[in-house]
């Protein structure tokens, strides 16, 4: 998938901050990018990770557009004020985390926005890393209008009764029977949330309910191995898994 742009091929995109409806009818900010041209284009909702609605989220939004997707990354941290992403996400953590209900409604707003665009091809996927990976799976089990979902090392899919909180009242694994689309999972074997054992439990639930899924697990990789600004970055594993993400979305959304 990399370096497949022909040298005489036109490429252009529009990337900007927009306003869209979210949880409780709130107007929230979102970062959106779309290919230039008439389309039609498939859509992707990128759910922010725990570090916040940050520069990396914007970069990944544009990366998907470079590959032909209209992409929206909603600011699920909007209710905690404005400032540097890390400061705002810290406020969310102090408050017990962004409630699942709020995130799902923000994702629904982003999906509805994508489907309303005149250049949409009618298909959309969701993806998230870290807590966003958990939310991507939860969205695929809870919302309509999702044709493919990618969970990148999402911790908290498997939860004990003691792990449940008012913000996270249900373990996503308990909703596996409601998964409505194909699922791709990307995991590092050296991480503790999720642990390889928790990934095993997730996979067992998917098999039990006969779901369409593919999990890829990488040795010598832990949490956030895509993040090139961290010591956790693993170039070979990151590149291989990005190829799998583009192949997965391409087969299911570019129809």
Name each region found by the language model:
Residues 1-255:
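N-terminal cap/leader regions of alpha/beta-hydrolase-fold enzymes
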């Amino acid at each position: 998938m990399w370096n497949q742009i022909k040298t005489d091929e036109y490429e252009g995109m529009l990337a900007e901050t927009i306003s869209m409806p979210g949880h409780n009818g709130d107007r929230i900010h979102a970062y959106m990018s779309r290919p230039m041209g008439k389309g039609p284009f498939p859509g992707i909702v990128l759910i922010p990770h725990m570090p916040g609605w940050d520069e990396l989220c914007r970069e990944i939004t544009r990366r998907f557009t470079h590959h032909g997707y209209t992409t929206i990354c909603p600011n699920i941290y909007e209710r905690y004020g404005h400032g540097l992403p890390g400061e705002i996400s810290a406020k969310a953590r102090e408050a017990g985390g962004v409630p699942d209900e709020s995130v799902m409604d923000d994702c629904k707003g982003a999906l509805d926005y994508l489907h309303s665009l005149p250049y949409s091809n009618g298909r959309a996927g969701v993806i998230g890393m870290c807590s966003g990976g958990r939310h991507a799976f939860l969205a695929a089990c809870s919302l309509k209008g999702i044709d493919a979902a990618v969970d990148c090392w999402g911790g908290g899919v498997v939860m004990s009764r003691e792990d449940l909180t008012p913000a996270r009242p249900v373990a996503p694994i308990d909703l596996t029977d409601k998964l409505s689309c194909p699922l791709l999972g990307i995991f590092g074997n050296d991480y503790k949330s999720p642990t390889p054992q928790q990934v095993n439990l997730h996979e067992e639930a998917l098999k039990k309910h006969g779901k369409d899924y593919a999990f890829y697990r990488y040795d010598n990789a832990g949490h956030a191995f895509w993040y090139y600004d961290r010591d956790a970055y693993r170039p070979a594993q990151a590149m291989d898994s990005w190829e799998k993400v583009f192949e997965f979305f391409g087969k299911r959304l570019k129809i």
